[in-house]
Amino acid sequence: QYDNIFYEKSYFSTAMYYRFFIPKIFCDFERVIYCDSDMLFKKDISELFFIDLKGKAIAACRDVAVLYSYRKRSEIWQRNIGHNFDKIGILSIDNYFNSGLIIFDINKCVKIQSVSLCLNILKKYDNLYLPDQDVLNIAFQNNVYFLHLRWNFQWTIHIECKQKSLYLSQQIIEEIYEARMDPGIIHYISETKP
């Protein structure tokens, strides 16, 4: 039914779109925690299940790797000039989240019809750089509660982001340091896995 809108990219398969359907598949549950398979759990994530989402439909962590790369205009972004946040409706790069860990408030997602919303956004944009993540960021950009970075510590951050102070806020730099010292989840983003 959806094959004509799902496309693969680089090392991303069509499985990346499965998270769009979580509110529909798990409609009998109040809350679902979605985690990518390339995550290492260092702490008990049960505390995430009961966190107050402050009325938001989802919770996630900011994608510091994307934020840093975008601000620096790194080689990755130069190769992918078509990835223009303004053009695809991302209002604030500072609020762009990583979709590797998402806490879904199922009732709120159903209320805003998030499944249809995500599918309609995907139909509109057929060449997104990070298709699933970009769609989720467009769909939920005003409806996300941001978790501390320790819950999605991207393992490449301290290696790739050598000039953090030039491109990231002091608050984000402090969160990166805290997350590195005491991670709840380590996320092995990128093609390189342990």
Write out the residue ranges for each language-model feature:
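Glycosyltransferase catalytic domains, chiefly GT-A lineage
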Residues: 1-194
